[in-house]
Swiss-Prot record:
Osteoclasts. It is a single-pass type II membrane protein. Keywords: Cell membrane, Disulfide bond, Endoplasmic reticulum, Glycoprotein, Hydrolase, Membrane, Microsome, NAD, NADP, Signal-anchor, Transferase, Transmembrane, Transmembrane helix. Homodimer. InterPro entries: ADP-ribosyl_cyclase (IPR003193). It comes from the Eukaryota. One of its GO terms (biological process) is intracellular signal transduction. This is ADP-ribosyl cyclase/cyclic ADP-ribose hydrolase 1. The lineage of its organism: Eukaryota, Metazoa, Chordata, Craniata, Vertebrata. Glycans are attached at N98, N118, N177, N207, N268.
Length: 298
């Protein structure tokens, strides 16, 4: 058999040189790939989380003192430090996705406040206007005008099984894998209590600039309306408000309001609806005095 010897063809490189090139490329690219993977992981985690409010405990205590000492001195006997401790005990050192209504029950039992009959105002997708209205009509109470609603409004909080402190970083979003967050369960519990305590004629402010003014997926549609007691509440007035200059997508004649009326009537509660309730419309027109729809009111 002939003894052939193959030499590298023109342009070929020895295998050792190619191995060195591969190592150099890996040395340059691998850190970039790892950094990208970490960044994607962090981004995914942040997308499933929301920023916890810094210094939640201090804010809750401060708001409680402001509310009971200045805004509603008739509640001066409420122990704000005890309220804070009971509030945080509901979720600290616990799985942030597995909070229960029972966790907040001691807080509900502790805070006693009576909203006068005929002064309860619910809202759905109209928070800003409802608060502006109740801010002028001081005798009206939205949930956030009560002590428990006031101390927690616009805050985000949660705990961690690994620590006894309130978490100051990120809290999980409420989703199908985390449906019982500390914040969402709190609002469900206090919303239920707010509705159960209502009496006489109650009111709800709805947003007719949305496709559906009433939604059974909202807190009002899923919790509050079903916890109105017919032996305490005899009438529900709905105010369907529309944005100044906006599109009127729903009204008292719409299908969603008919659904609300059916739910309320089945609970033996009378129902009335009014589009663009005049006193609330005046509040809207403060910011748009020159708009034709506001000029008509003057």
């Amino acid at each position: 058999m002939p003894d052939y010897e193959f030499s590298p063809a023109s342009g070929d490189r020895p295998r050792s040189w190619i191995s060195k090139q591969v190592l150099i490329v890996l040395g340059v690219c691998l850190p970039v790939i790892l950094a990208l993977a970490i960044w994607v992981g962090v981004l995914t985690w942040r997308q499933s989380s929301m920023g916890a409010t810094d210094h939640v405990s201090a804010i809750v205590l401060g708001r409680c003192l402001t509310y009971t000492r200045n805004m509603h001195p008739e509640l001066r006997n409420q122990d704000c430090k005890k309220i804070l401790n009971t509030f945080t005990s509901a979720f600290v050192s616990k799985d942030p996705c597995n909070i229960t209504k029972e966790d907040y029950q001691p807080l509900i039992d502790l805070v006693t406040q009576t909203v006068p009959c005929n002064k309860t105002l619910f809202w759905s997708r109209s928070k800003e206007l409802a608060h502006q209205y109740s801010g002028i009509q001081k005798e009206m109470f939205t949930l956030e005008d009560t002590l428990l609603g006031y101390i927690a409004d616009n805050l985000v909080w949660c705990g961690d099984p690994r620590t006894s402190e309130v978490k100051e970083e990120f809290c999980p979003y409420r989703n199908e894998n985390c449906s019982s967050t500390a914040t969402s369960v709190f609002w469900t519990v206090v919303s239920q209590k707010f509705a159960e305590s209502a009496c006489g004629t109650v009111y709800v402010m709805l947003n007719g600039s949305r496709t559906t003014a009433f939604s059974k997926a909202s807190t009002f549609g899923s919790v509050e309306v079903f916890n109105l007691h017919p032996d305490r509440v005899h009438t529900l007035h709905a105010w369907v408000m529309h944005d100044i200059g906006g599109v009127e997508r729903d009204s008292c004649l719409g299908s969603s309001i008919k659904e609300l009326k059916s739910i309320v009537n089945q609970r033996n509660i009378s129902f009335f609806c009014q589009d663009d309730y005049r006193p609330a419309r005046f509040v809207q027109c403060v910011r748009h005095p020159e708009h034709p729809s506001c000029s008509v009111l003057m």
